[in-house]
């Protein structure tokens, strides 16, 4: 592969690419000018053309770009490399601002490799993909900082058929040593996981992928994402759902659980600026697919504020720099004018995180028990009165006695205060003496809190206890 990458290259007509790269050098200086220590270094995806957007990148002050290299364009026939495409990348190496670091995401299987005209079909032979990306690493050398191996391999949109952790793990195992042999300093990334897909990552570890990547890439620009990065939901087991922005922390937890304290690179984050109706996923037809331009700017600030609190997230790339067609997530409008988010990114790149507010709400509701009093003694029916307050809204209060359910109070409107009261006749039938009454409250984000009090059941003389709980 390395020999053929140095051979004369056949000319091909240039199509609209997803591409770009870097002029190496001045790296130490640029790192000194980057965001403060511990904060994610910002960048943008160049998804529109081979135009390096030199003026915009200089104005933004970011020193990272992410681009796509489509295998089917670069090697349309086995061993036959497109001179035009290679030249386009190499031209960018010299046109991008000095010190720019480049992530190249290698996608797009050629038909000769799979027999399919759909370039999102995964490689039939991982060694073919490895040979190609290894050849790129040798050809591009230090001009490319990192290689992202595939894109959203956990999604059938990018991995035709069903996502296959074992097959993708094989791709990593084949590619990693080849890239490192060609360019030892290159960082090898797990392809961006759709919406922080930590269950898929767990399966990669089970399939032996540990040791075959240097960092895990995640994507948080999920379909119809219109909530603040501070907002999240939890699964019933307490873990954040993958589509929550902050679920990159669950990705990190999976890595640590597998003894793999490597960094995370967020290679796509964004919010669309549109009032059009959602057309994708579970929420299709049920809500808007985007936010206002000012909300986008606010969410950008909040996102980088959260990332600054987690130094294991080293790089965070906005997708894309400029709106293109139906994709209106850019910092620039299609005509090149600046959205408010451009200034927000510029401020972060120059001054770092300036927010001081909390990144999300992680505490459960405040529970107030009006009755009974702690260590109260009762006989017969027991009056119970409880309320829970939470700025995110309260969805449920659960009452338990000695770990057994008494009842739930629920309200799917998630009021800021939820209350419940009853005269519990079942209290007459619990065991005599000391009992523990527990109150559990859950907010809209599925944050949970609980409090318990002790009550003493004094039975009437002559009453025989019938065990209920």
Where are these regions (language model features)?
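N-terminal secretory signal peptides that target proteins for export/translocation
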Residues: 1-14
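Bacterial N-terminal signal peptides
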Residues: 19-34
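Substrate-binding cleft and catalytic face of glycoside hydrolase catalytic domains
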Residues: 60-196, 271-274, 319, 324
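Long, low-complexity serine/threonine/glycine- and acidic-rich segments characteristic of extracellular
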Residues: 360-462
């Amino acid at each position: 592969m390395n020999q053929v990458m140095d051979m004369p290259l056949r000319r091909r007509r240039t199509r609209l690419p997803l591409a770009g790269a870097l002029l190496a050098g001045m790296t130490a200086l640029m790192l000194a000018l980057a965001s403060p220590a511990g904060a994610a270094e910002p960048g943008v995806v160049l998804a529109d053309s081979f135009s390096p957007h030199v003026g915009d990148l200089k104005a933004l002050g970011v020193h990272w770009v992410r681009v796509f290299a489509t295998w089917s364009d670069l090697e349309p026939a086995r061993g036959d490399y497109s001179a035009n495409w290679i030249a386009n990348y190499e031209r960018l190496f010299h046109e991008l601002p000095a010190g720019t670091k480049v992530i190249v995401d290698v996608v797009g299987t050629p038909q000769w490799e799979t027999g399919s005209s759909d370039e999102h079909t995964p490689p039939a032979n991982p060694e073919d993909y490895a040979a190609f990306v290894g050849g790129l690493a040798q050809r591009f050398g230090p001009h490319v900082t990192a290689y992202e191996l595939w894109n959203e391999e956990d999604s059938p949109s990018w991995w035709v058929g069903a996502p296959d952790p074992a097959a993708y793990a094989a791709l990593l195992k084949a590619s990693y040593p080849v890239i490192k042999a060609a360019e030892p300093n290159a960082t090898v990334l797990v392809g961006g996981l759709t919406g922080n897909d930590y269950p898929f990552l767990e399966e990669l570890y089970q399939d032996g992928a540990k040791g075959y990547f240097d960092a895990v890439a995640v994507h948080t620009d999920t379909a119809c994402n219109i909530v603040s990065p501070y907002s999240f939901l939890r699964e019933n087991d307490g873990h954040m759902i993958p589509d929550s922005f902050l679920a990159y922390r669950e990705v990190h937890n999976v890595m640590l659980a597998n003894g793999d304290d490597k960094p995370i690179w967020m290679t796509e984050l964004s919010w669309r600026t549109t009032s059009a109706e959602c057309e994708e996923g579970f929420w299709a037809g049920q809500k808007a697919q985007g936010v206002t331009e000012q909300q986008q700017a606010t969410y950008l600030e909040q996102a980088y504020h959260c990332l600054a609190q987690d130094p294991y997230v080293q790089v965070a790339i906005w997708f894309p720099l400029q709106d293109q067609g139906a994709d209106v997530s850019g910092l620039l409008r299609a005509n090149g004018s600046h959205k408010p988010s451009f200034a927000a990114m510029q401020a972060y790149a120059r001054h770092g995180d300036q927010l001081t507010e909390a990144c999300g709400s992680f505490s459960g509701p405040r529970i107030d028990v009006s009755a009974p009093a702690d260590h109260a003694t009762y006989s017969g029916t027991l009056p119970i009165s409880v309320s829970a307050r939470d700025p995110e809204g309260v969805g449920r209060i659960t009452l338990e006695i000695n770990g057994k359910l008494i009842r739930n109070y629920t309200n799917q409107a998630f009021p800021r205060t939820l209350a419940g009261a009853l005269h519990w006749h079942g209290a007459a039938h619990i065991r005599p003496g000391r009992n523990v009454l527990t109150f559990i409250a859950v907010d809209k984000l599925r944050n949970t809190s609980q409090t318990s009090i002790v009550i003493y059941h004094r039975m009437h003389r002559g009453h025989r206890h019938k065990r209920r709980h």
